[in-house]
């Protein structure tokens, strides 16, 4: 296999464009899972789709390389679905509109889904190539963004017969990270007493247009958090006068700094 960097990039981006056309919100990955399954079968790969819609795709070793160790290429199919204020976007039905300015890809008013669409796209491109390789397995899981329920449900037998696992969900360019990873979700509840408002004046306090970012990758960057700003503002106001709080809300995605 002898390909130029441009040929490889064009091939990966073509696979990514396929993914961008398919809505794939967390816990709604059936359509994209079915698409990838059929596409991998068309490459001559063997495919297992489990009840969670995780995919296990096996590419046989090249001739003469059967004794080489198995390598797993792993990514996830779901994406964080957010849109700018005023943008009409339904994460269950709307495709992602990609804008390519020649240097960067971005989406038109929504999240792009490169996490982890570009990782899945790279793996799908690799599965089509003819080169000297041992057995390759691509594993694509569901619901990584909200709870990793796909990874938790994956049968361990698909991991134990491989020597290497390469996760294609890193945030750093041109870098490999040797580590393990995990996540913890914390749900907190507090009982409150509702009552009819006594004050006639109502005010809406909005914090927007902040930097934002991924709560894992950018949590140490010191970016302002809209929820914290609102809480601090309410606390300051309450020290000076009595207020009644009707509601407070933020982005639905757990892993986005609001």
Q: What residue ranges belong to the model's regions?
A:
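Buried hydrophobic packing segments
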Residues: 36, 120-127, 230-234
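Conserved beta-strand termini and adjacent loop/short-helix elements that scaffold enzyme active sites
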Residues: 50-52, 141, 248
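Active-site metal-coordination/substrate-binding segment of hydrolases
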Residues: 65-146, 151-155, 162-163, 202
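Midchain, well-structured core segments that form catalytic/ion-binding scaffolds
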Residues: 94-97, 101-106, 110, 145-146, ...
């Amino acid at each position: 296999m002898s390909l130029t960097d441009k040929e490889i990039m064009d091939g990966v981006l073509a696979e990514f464009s396929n993914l961008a056309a398919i809505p794939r919100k967390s816990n709604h990955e059936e359509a994209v899972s079915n698409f990838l399954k059929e596409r991998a079968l068309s490459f001559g790969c063997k495919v297992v789709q489990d009840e969670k819609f995780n995919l296990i795709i096996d590419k046989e070793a090249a001739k003469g390389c059967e004794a080489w160790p198995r390598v797993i290429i792993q990514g996830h199919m779901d994406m964080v679905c957010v849109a700018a204020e005023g943008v009409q976007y339904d994460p269950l039905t709307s495709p992602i509109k990609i804008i390519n300015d020649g240097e960067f890809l971005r989406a038109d008013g929504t999240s792009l889904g490169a996490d982890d669409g570009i990782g899945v796209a790279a793996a799908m491109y690799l599965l089509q190539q003819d080169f000297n390789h041992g057995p390759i397995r691509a594993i694509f899981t569901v619901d990584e963004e909200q709870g990793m329920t796909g990874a938790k449900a994956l049968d361990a037998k698909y991991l134990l017969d491989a020597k290497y696992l390469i996760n294609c969900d890193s945030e750093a360019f041109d870098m490999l990270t040797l580590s393990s990873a995990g996540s913890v979700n914390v749900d907190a509840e507090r009982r409150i007493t509702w009552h009819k408002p006594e004050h006639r004046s109502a005010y809406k306090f909005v914090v927007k247009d902040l930097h934002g970012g991924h709560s894992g990758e950018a949590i140490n960057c010191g970016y302002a958090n809209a929820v914290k700003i609102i809480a601090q503002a309410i606390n300051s106001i309450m020290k000076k006068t009595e207020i009644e709080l009707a509601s407070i809300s933020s982005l639905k995605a757990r892993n986005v700094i609001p």
